[in-house]
């Protein structure tokens, strides 16, 4: 099995002030980030410029939390891929469960956003996940695969585009609840997603695509989760706003060394 480069992303969501973002990003950037790990943080849109200015590390990338599915135009309140690129951003989170569940974003809309970003050369952190009711109904894989099928419909089997996709499995019932999926539960889904990729996209590529876990991941549980062979890192919410985020970076680097 080829070694997949570990990936950890910090999703700041709708949190922080200008002063906090400046100091927090500067603190992460000043930390000795292992060169073996890809590290990104995603502040809100209004904090992007502050985060970019505070980032002094070549090992830390700044990401956007969302993007619109069209280019520049009459889309009040939206942000285009072109605008993100103009700021020098290389990464964007797409399809987060809060976008899907609260904002009503559909599988098709998430997929179209991802295609536009990928076509322009960005790396997409593409989120999938099931609700508690869907898990109880034994529809976990069906729901997650449907979200990936929508992406496949947009980008096909293009190796060039899929190479810039990081899949983030985030069980909705675990996000912000403090209820984390067990390593066994998370690994089972990651195995299923990798199997789908091997069968529907590319068998060889399935061994290379990174699938990370998101859902109340923190400094206390990331080591056991990271020991699972198919979990390649984390998309971190609340813990990314705390000093423990750098601890998680180190733990991931050592666990996946």
Swiss-Prot record:
Keywords: Gluconeogenesis, Glycolysis, Isomerase. Pathway: Carbohydrate biosynthesis; gluconeogenesis; Carbohydrate degradation; glycolysis; D-glyceraldehyde 3-phosphate from glycerone phosphate: step 1/1. It is an enzyme of class 5 (isomerase). Signal peptide: none annotated. PROSITE patterns: TIM_1 (PS00171), TIM_2 (PS51440). Substrate binds at residues 11, 13. GO terms for molecular function: triose-phosphate isomerase activity. SUPFAM superfamilies: Triosephosphate isomerase (TIM) (SSF51351). The active site is at 96 (electrophile), 170 (proton acceptor). InterPro entries: Aldolase_TIM, TIM_sf, TrioseP_Isoase_bac/euk, Triosephosphate_isomerase, Triosephosphate_isomerase_AS. Belongs to the triosephosphate isomerase family. PANTHER family: TRIOSEPHOSPHATE ISOMERASE (PTHR21139:SF2). This is Triosephosphate isomerase. It comes from Giardia intestinalis.
